[in-house]
């Protein structure tokens, strides 16, 4: 029984993108947006290491050469033009190298697709999500709509993740441009999926847009990232990326179920 639990747990994490215990790094990127965030983090971390090494070297050198035993009579240095120019220009160059990719990524994340293949609307409630697929309805029909609640711990099946599983997943096709419209029906929420690099605030009376391009099939887990009341921690988000054929079959089945 223990081996079965471990095996199921291993394959669940291997095939899904979710937070793990004692995780220190990022989840694997599934969108160009998230890959850009990870790359920017690595670039900035490189400069942080350079600055840390330089500051430590200067500190150790000062302690070694300018202590009381080495220099009983302290030197009186009140001005140094060269060093002042260096410590003014060098940080400015570093900030420039950080700012250019940062602004490029920021504006690419803020861009909204003019003609996306699929539009999905996420509506936050206390404490669940409602999703609307409005691309498949005619003028006299309702859109494909369903609610997504967290599965209670007592109802979890073997291998499902605690506090992260939902009864109805958001199913999307992989390698397809999506547009997410996020809003709220009551208080502030935030629709966030780390592997997709998405965190979009759900504000009552306002529609916020974000674009997503999932590059690989898989199951991606997220949660509401805005404190919204007592059960804020029980608003998970699950996005399942499938092939275009499987997505079309899922939409057809959902429309049939909704009609019946």
Curated annotation (Swiss-Prot):
UniProt topological domain (Mitochondrial intermembrane) ranges: 1-43, 106-260
Could you tell me what reaction this enzyme catalyses?
A: 4 Fe(II)-[cytochrome c] + O2 + 8 H(+)(in) = 4 Fe(III)-[cytochrome c] + 2 H2O + 4 H(+)(out)
Its domain of life?
Eukaryota
Q: Which Gene3D superfamilies match?
A: 1.10.287.90, Cupredoxins - blue copper proteins
Cofactor field? Cu cation
Keyword Mitochondrion recorded: yes
GO BP term, pick one: ATP synthesis coupled electron transport
- Gene Ontology molecular function: copper ion binding; cytochrome-c oxidase activity
Show which residues constitute the signal peptide.
Answer: none
Entries under CDD domains matching the protein: CcO_II_C
Which GO CC terms are listed, alphabetically? mitochondrial inner membrane
The positions annotated for binding Cu cation A1 are 189, 224, 228, 235
Give the protein's recorded name.
Cytochrome c oxidase subunit 2
């Amino acid at each position: 029984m223990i081996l079965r639990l471990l095996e199921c747990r291993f394959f669940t994490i291997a095939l899904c993108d979710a937070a793990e215990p004692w995780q220190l790094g990022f989840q694997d990127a599934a969108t160009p947006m998230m890959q850009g965030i990870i790359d920017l983090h690595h670039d900035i971390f490189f400069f942080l290491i350079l600055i840390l090494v330089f500051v430590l070297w200067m500190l150790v050198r000062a302690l070694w050469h300018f202590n009381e035993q080495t220099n009983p009579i302290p030197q009186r240095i009140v001005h140094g033009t060269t060093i002042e120019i260096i410590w003014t220009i060098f940080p400015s160059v570093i900030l420039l190298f950080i700012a250019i990719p940062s602004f490029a990524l920021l504006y690419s994340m803020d861009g909204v697709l003019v003609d996306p293949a699929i539009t999905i609307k996420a509506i936050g409630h206390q404490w669940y999500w409602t999703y609307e697929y409005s691309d498949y309805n005619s003028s006299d029909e309702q859109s494909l709509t369903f609610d997504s609640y967290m599965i209670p711990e007592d109802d979890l099946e073997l291998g499902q993740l605690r506090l992260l599983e939902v009864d109805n997943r958001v199913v999307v096709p992989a390698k397809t441009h999506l547009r997410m419209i996020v809003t709220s029906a009551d208080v502030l929420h935030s629709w966030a999926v780390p592997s997709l690099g998405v965190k979009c605030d759900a504000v009552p009376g306002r529609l916020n847009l974000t674009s997503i391009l999932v590059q690989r099939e898989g199951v991606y887990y997220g949660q509401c990232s805005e404190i919204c009341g007592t059960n804020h921690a029980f608003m998970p988000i699950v996005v399942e990326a499938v092939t275009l054929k499987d997505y079309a079959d899922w939409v057809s089945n959902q429309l049939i179920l909704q009609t019946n």
